[in-house]
Swiss-Prot record:
Binding of Mg(2+) 1, residues: D9, D146
UniProt cross-references to NCBIfam families, sorted A to Z: ruvC
Entry EC no(s): 3.1.21.10
SUPFAM superfamilies: Ribonuclease H-like (SSF53098)
Molecular-function annotations in GO: crossover junction DNA endonuclease activity; DNA binding; magnesium ion binding
Name of the protein in its database record: Crossover junction endodeoxyribonuclease RuvC
CDD domains: RuvC
Entries under PANTHER family matching the protein: CROSSOVER JUNCTION ENDODEOXYRIBONUCLEASE RUVC
Family membership: Belongs to the RuvC family.
Catalytic reactions on record: Endonucleolytic cleavage at a junction such as a reciprocal single-stranded crossover between two homologous DNA duplexes (Holliday junction)
Positions of the catalytic residues: D9, E74, D146
GO terms classed as biological process: DNA recombination; DNA repair
Length: 180
């Protein structure tokens, strides 16, 4: 059975999305990108409600274009700055709203769970996540950081959040808790 998974890495300025297809234990890249709510110069577009609408509308368009059957989104972590955490939570809420409005089932994973599933340890650096996403999906180059995180979230969901043990049965070699 083949189905598509939409992974989302929520952010108020940049929201990453990634769509993969799962057929049995095999994963295939479909699409990825970044939703930007800033101008090219890093300044904010309009006000907060407008930025949230951009996230909601853009994800609705992604869903219409790629027709995923399931979605996975990264959970919010509590930042040192409470204001940043609240803003991230609002961006995440806009993303979840887009998924709910389209009737998609949603799975939520912490960044630690996603990294553990894709890289083999929960405290992996961004470049390690990018490299593993590239390898697991046979991409020609490294995906951008926000897209890589979203694709990693989708990969985590595809493997049931079970980590490298599941990957080992899919034909990848695991040694010392790491994919080789």
């Amino acid at each position: 059975m083949t189905f598509r998974i939409l992974g989302i890495d929520p952010g108020l300025r940049l929201t990453g999305f990634g769509v993969i297809e799962k057929t049995g234990e095999k994963l295939a890249y479909v699409a990825s990108g970044t939703i930007k709510t800033t101008t090219g110069k890093g300044s904010e577009i309009e006000d907060l409600p407008t930025r949230l609408k951009i996230i909601l509308d853009s994800l609705a368009e992604v869903i219409d274009n790629y027709q995923p059957q399931q979605a996975a989104i990264e959970k919010v972590f509590v930042n040192v700055n409470p204001q940043s955490t609240l803003l991230l939570g609002q961006a995440r809420g806009a993303a979840i709203s887009a998924l709910v409005l389209q009737g998609l089932p949603i799975a939520e994973y912490t960044a630690l769970q996603v990294k553990q599933s894709v890289v083999g340890h929960g405290h992996a650096a961004k470049d390690q996540v990018q490299e593993m996403v590239k390898r697991l999906l046979n991409l020609p180059g490294l995906p951008r950081p926000d897209s890589a995180d979203a694709l990693a979230c989708a990969i985590c969901h595809a493997h049931g959040g079970q980590g490298l043990g599941k990957l080992a049965t899919a034909g990848f070699r695991v040694k010392g808790g790491r994919l080789i």
